[in-house]
């Protein structure tokens, strides 16, 4: 069967295993071909081809429900649910999302993008089913490190305690599937999933419990013997862990053996209890470049299929690279510096630091809340912790930031990567709410560099800082030093940089928007409008003195952040509180979730390109002249 002919999962239910193997090869070819052009999450999807096929053959979607944790491994699911024709638009502006999207298909029952949420969502779906007297199956596919997140264990504890019927598929792609271990564990699994074995276990357990005196001791002896034998083949005795939480454990299963997967899933369908199916898969399976470097192809830019090398490489280092290099230089002379990541050493750039200072590098897993409070403990103990995290993931640690860092005024530095619009990953990954969460919090210092050089300057300043501090920077690197060299005077918080004079209007830009504001000023100059240009690098505290001096002309604020609660709203509140009646125009992100697409496309969509902002400023100035 051709992949392009699949309209729904029903189309693959009657295929032979030979036909299914051919279909798996087609899917892998499509994944590699499309992602090589569009970018995206390749390694994880290559690893779940057979698993996703088995799920759709055994269960009846969309009546049965599946929640994909993180959601980045849902590409195969999309291809099997009639979306082949639009798959070529993956992650493009107006095209298919790289994550499950309820508006995209009835098969996408729950939207995900951040880790460790699937079990809680699936439990909610299962309880909704039970409360309404329905009988369909609810599955959660979780893996790729998401089990390091605390939410998973909260959900497991709740589901096991309530004995809610649901199926958790643990996609374990950290273990290799050695033939001998795989064969032995598969043999044990075959025994355990057979209906006869399951029934026999129940009968034996019931019979032993009825025997006077010797019944319970015999039960304990047999249980001990079973666990001893199983522990030889099941690594780290996962069975006991999940059983203790109230789940029936199956596995480990070879995640690339379609027959074994279907056999197991057919069996667990019959159980009226919470179940964990432990599946072993190999990231990047079927494409050698991704198999050899799975982390490199976890989330990849467009690449050449033949070599696996990126199609386009930037000429500038990333903000993460500059951050890590600067932090490493600082650590050479300061033994108190500690770097922290939440399972993203490569994405944040901290792999560089880890190679040089392994004892001072801490990867806490997908546990942002824990990371912040642990950093607070480090600071209370006399260390200087730096937590590098994507701005969108930092949202999870809002309470810890207030309660554990800012209230005691501890010296924790947050390095907020991907602040602003991140591009093709879309709404779940845009870092556009961090300022709104941090600006109201006492003791917090918030900085936003205009370019790579200013990031270096701010990083070095933090060595002398004793307050909670956040430095936010975008995904796309900027270097403005050719036109605007770094100032000679030392960096100080509460001071802005007046980059250009101008009496007609003042442009106040934050971080990544400084580059856009420079172009706006140039366009205004061509129209005879002279604009002051200000780099508002110290977002909190603001440069109140300079702001008061600029308030004798219209004020325009520019930020790659939501308008509500952002920099512009704080400027407006300050001017109002001081009784300064300067007309204001604020540019930022409106009250909407921004879709996926290239940053330049999204800026245009939001009216934040230099040309569109200039038009609005000119109109506003003309309207102001009429009053």
Language-model segments: which ranges?
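N-terminal amphipathic, basic-rich helices that act as targeting or association modules
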Residues: 1-79, 243-247, 254-261, 278-279
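Long, well-ordered, tryptophan-enriched scaffold segments
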Residues: 3, 174-323
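Cofactor-binding active-site loop characterized by glycine-rich and histidine/acidic residues
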Residues: 41-162, 337, 341-342, 350-351
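Non-catalytic terminal/interface segments that mediate subunit docking, oligomerization
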Residues: 65, 281-395, 400-410, 467, ...
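Structural signature of the thiamine diphosphate
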Residues: 216, 220-289, 411-416, 435-484, ...
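Glycine-/acidic-rich phosphate or pyrophosphate-binding loops and their flanking alpha/beta elements
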Residues: 263-266, 298-299, 308, 318-333, ...
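Peripheral docking tails and interdomain loops at the edges
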Residues: 302-306, 310-313, 423-425, 434, ...
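Generic long, charged, amphipathic alpha-helical segments
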Residues: 363, 521-550
């Amino acid at each position: 069967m051709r992949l392009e002919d699949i309209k729904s999962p029903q189309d693959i239910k009657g295929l032979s295993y030979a036909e299914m193997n051919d279909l798996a090869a087609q899917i892998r070819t499509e994944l590699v071909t499309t992602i090589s052009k569009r970018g995206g999450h390749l390694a994880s999807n290559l690893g779940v081809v057979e698993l996703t096929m088995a799920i759709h053959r055994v269960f009846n979607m969309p009546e049965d429900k599946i929640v994909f944790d993180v959601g980045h491994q849902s590409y195969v699911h999309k291809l099997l649910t009639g979306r082949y024709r639009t798959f070529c638009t993956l992650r493009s502006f107006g095209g298919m999302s790289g994550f499950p999207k309820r508006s995209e298909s009835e098969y996408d029952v729950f939207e995900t993008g951040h880790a460790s949420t699937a079990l809680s969502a699936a439990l909610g779906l299962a309880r909704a089913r039970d409360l309404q007297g329905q009988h369909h199956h609810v599955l959660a596919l979780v893996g790729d490190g998401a089990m390091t997140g605390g939410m998973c264990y909260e959900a497991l504890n709740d589901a096991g305690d309530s004995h809610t019927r649901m199926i958790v598929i643990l996609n374990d792609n950290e273990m290799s599937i050695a033939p001998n271990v795989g064969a032995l564990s598969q043999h044990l699994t075959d025994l355990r999933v057979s209906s006869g074995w399951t029934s026999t276990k129940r009968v034996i357990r019931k019979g032993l419990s009825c025997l006077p005196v010797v019944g319970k001791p015999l039960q304990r002896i047999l249980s001990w013997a079973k666990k001893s034998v199983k522990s030889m083949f099941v690594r780290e005795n996962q069975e006991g862990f999940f059983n203790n939480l109230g789940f029936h454990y199956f596995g480990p299963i070879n995640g690339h053996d379609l027959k074994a997967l279907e056999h197991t899933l057919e069996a667990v369908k019959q159980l009226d209890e919470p179940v964990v199916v432990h599946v072993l898969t190999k990231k990047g399976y079927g494409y050698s470049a991704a198999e050899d470097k799975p982390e490199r192809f976890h989330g990849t830019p467009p690449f050449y299929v033949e070599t696996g090398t990126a199609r386009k490489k930037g000429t500038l280092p990333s903000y993460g690279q500059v951050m890590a290099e600067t932090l490493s230089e600082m650590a050479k002379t300061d033994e108190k510096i500690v770097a922290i990541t939440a399972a993203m050493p490569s994405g944040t750039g901290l792999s560089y630091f880890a190679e040089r200072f392994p004892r001072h590098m801490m990867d806490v897993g997908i546990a942002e809340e824990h990371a912040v409070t642990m950093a607070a403990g480090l600071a209370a103990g006399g260390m200087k912790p730096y937590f590098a995290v994507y701005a969108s993931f930092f949202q999870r640690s809002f309470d810890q930031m207030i309660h554990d860092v800012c209230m005691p005024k501890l010296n924790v530095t947050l390095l907020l990567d991907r602040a602003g619009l991140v591009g093709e990953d879309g709404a779940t990954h845009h870092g556009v709410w961090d300022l709104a969460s941090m600006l109201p919090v006492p003791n917090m210092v918030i900085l936003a560099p205009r370019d790579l050089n200013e990031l270096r300057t701010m990083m070095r300043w933090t060595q002398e800082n004793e307050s909670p501090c956040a430095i936010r920077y975008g995904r796309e690197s900027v270097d403005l030093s050719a036109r605007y060299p770094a100032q000679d005077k030392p960096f100080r918080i509460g001071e802005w940089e007046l980059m250009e004079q101008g009496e007609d209007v003042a442009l106040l830009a934050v971080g990544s928007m400084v580059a856009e504001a420079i172009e706006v000023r140039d366009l205004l100059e061509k129209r005879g409008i002279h604009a002051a240009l200000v780099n508002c690098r110290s977002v909190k505290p603001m440069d109140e003195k300079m702001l008061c001096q600029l308030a004798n002309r219209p004020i325009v604020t520019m930020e790659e952040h939501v308008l509500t609660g952002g920099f512009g709203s704080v400027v407006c509140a300050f001017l109002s509180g001081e009784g300064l009646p300067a007309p204001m125009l604020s540019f930022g992100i409106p009250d909407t979730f921004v879709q996926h697409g290239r940053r330049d496309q999204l800026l245009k969509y939001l009216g934040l390109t230099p040309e569109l902002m200039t038009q609005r400023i000119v109109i506003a100035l003309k309207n102001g002249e009429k009053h």
